[in-house]
């Protein structure tokens, strides 16, 4: 007799190896974070930092992708989100090598003496606009509490010379962010432009910067093909995570 299927929990997102509750987080699990967590280069990373960790999604994805010797830090300003990230991480297979810090990244950066081979962030990207329903969501969406210049400066203090700082942004914000990064001494090394459907213009961009100069590798990613199914490239990128892929 076949066993009944385990019902999916409804207060978050179930992945193949972990669950992310996000009901106490301003920004929910979404494609942007999943793209960045699956895309960021982890090959040489021994220490990983997630700035603005929210529910802990990126931290958990990168923990799954890295060896057991790799340690990860997740920094989140909002206390409720940081607590939920701790709960998600404690319930995961990688709790022993992850630390969550409820802190302002500028203050936290000044207290650090070690550097990271990989830093990731799914940062706020809207200028101040229409008021959000809650202060926490406004903090997560708008650059008023963490502008891009400050984010880049903090990452510069924490990155190793050969390390990578990776972000996901709207396509419309990518060029301005890259210019600002260049002004602060960063070098763009990886860029992937992401389109939702065949025939559509890119709507997101994945960027990896390094303090060290070098060739920039650029490519494109299509999320869905003409049949509206996930494209082979998107499946290859994310199949280790999506439950039904």
Swiss-Prot record:
Its EC number is 2.1.1.223. GO terms for biological process: tRNA processing. It is found in: Cytoplasm. One of its GO terms (cellular component) is cytoplasm. It is an enzyme of class 2 (transferase). Its main location: cytoplasm. It catalyses: adenosine(37) in tRNA1(Val) + S-adenosyl-L-methionine = N(6)-methyladenosine(37) in tRNA1(Val) + S-adenosyl-L-homocysteine + H(+). The keyword Methyltransferase applies. GO terms for molecular function: nucleic acid binding; rRNA (adenine-N6,N6-)-dimethyltransferase activity; tRNA (adenine-N6)-methyltransferase activity. Keywords: Cytoplasm, Methyltransferase, S-adenosyl-L-methionine, Transferase, tRNA processing. InterPro entries: DNA_methylase_N6_adenine_CS, rRNA_Ade_Mease_Trfase_CS, SAM-dependent_MTases_sf, Small_mtfrase_dom, tRNA_Adenine-N(6)_MTase, tRNA_adenine-N6_MeTrfase. SUPFAM superfamilies: S-adenosyl-L-methionine-dependent methyltransferases. Belongs to the methyltransferase superfamily. tRNA (adenine-N(6)-)-methyltransferase family. Specifically methylates the adenine in position 37 of tRNA(1)(Val) (anticodon cmo5UAC). NCBIfam families: tRm6a37MtseTrmN. This is tRNA1(Val) (adenine(37)-N6)-methyltransferase. It comes from Cronobacter sakazakii (strain ATCC BAA-894). The lineage of its organism: Bacteria, Pseudomonadati, Pseudomonadota, Gammaproteobacteria, Enterobacterales.
């Amino acid at each position: 007799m076949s066993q009944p299927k385990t019902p999916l929990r409804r207060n978050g997102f179930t992945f193949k190896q972990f669950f992310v509750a996000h009901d106490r987080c301003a920004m929910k699990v979404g494609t942007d974070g999943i793209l960045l967590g699956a895309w960021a280069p982890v090959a040489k990373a021994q220490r990983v930092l997630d700035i603005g960790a929210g529910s802990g999604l990126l931290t958990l994805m990168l923990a799954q992708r890295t060896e057991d010797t790799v340690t990860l830090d997740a920094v989140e300003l909002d206390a409720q989100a940081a607590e939920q990230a701790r709960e998600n991480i404690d319930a995961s297979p990688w709790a022993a090598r992850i630390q969550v810090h409820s802190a302002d990244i500028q203050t936290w950066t000044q207290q650090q003496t070690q550097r990271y081979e990989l830093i990731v962030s799914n940062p706020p990207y809207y200028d101040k606009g229409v008021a959000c329903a809650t202060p926490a969501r406004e903090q997560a969406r708008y650059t008023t509490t963490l502008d891009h210049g400050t984010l880049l400066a903090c990452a510069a203090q924490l990155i190793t010379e050969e390390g990578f700082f990776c972000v996901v942004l709207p396509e419309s914000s990518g060029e301005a962010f890259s210019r600002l990064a260049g002004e602060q001494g960063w070098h763009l090394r990886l860029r992937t432009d992401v389109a939702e459907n065949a025939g559509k213009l890119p709507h997101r961009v994945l960027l990896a910067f390094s303090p060290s100069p070098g060739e920039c590798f650029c490519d494109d990613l299509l999320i869905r093909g003409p049949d509206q199914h996930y494209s082979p490239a998107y499946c290859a990128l994310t199949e280790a995570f999506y439950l039904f892929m």
